[in-house]
């Protein structure tokens, strides 16, 4: 059976990078959620918190919008 988790139990591999780049921009999780909503992504602060903690999956569409708002490439968010 295939399990969709990293070896350390996280549900995504981009949460730590999202947190890092958000912090570098000096914006809160709520502000990031607001900016994502302006860009058409229906997401709230709690979802951002869960993504950064590795507790929530991130779709490819979400990743693209998050990268755009953080002014990064999706590759940078995936740390590849």
What does each model-identified segment do?
Residues 59-76:
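DNA major-groove recognition helix of helix-turn-helix/homeodomain DNA-binding modules
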Residues 18, 29, 45, 60-63:
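Helix-turn-helix DNA-binding elements, focusing on the entry/boundary residues of the two helices
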Residues 1-25:
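A short, Lys/Arg-rich alpha-helix, primarily the initiator
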Residues 79-80:
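Phosphate-coordinating loops and pocket residues in cytosolic domains that bind phosphorylated ligands
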Residues 5-6, 49-51:
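Short, contiguous strand/loop micro-motifs
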Residues 26-50:
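Short alpha-helical DNA-recognition segment
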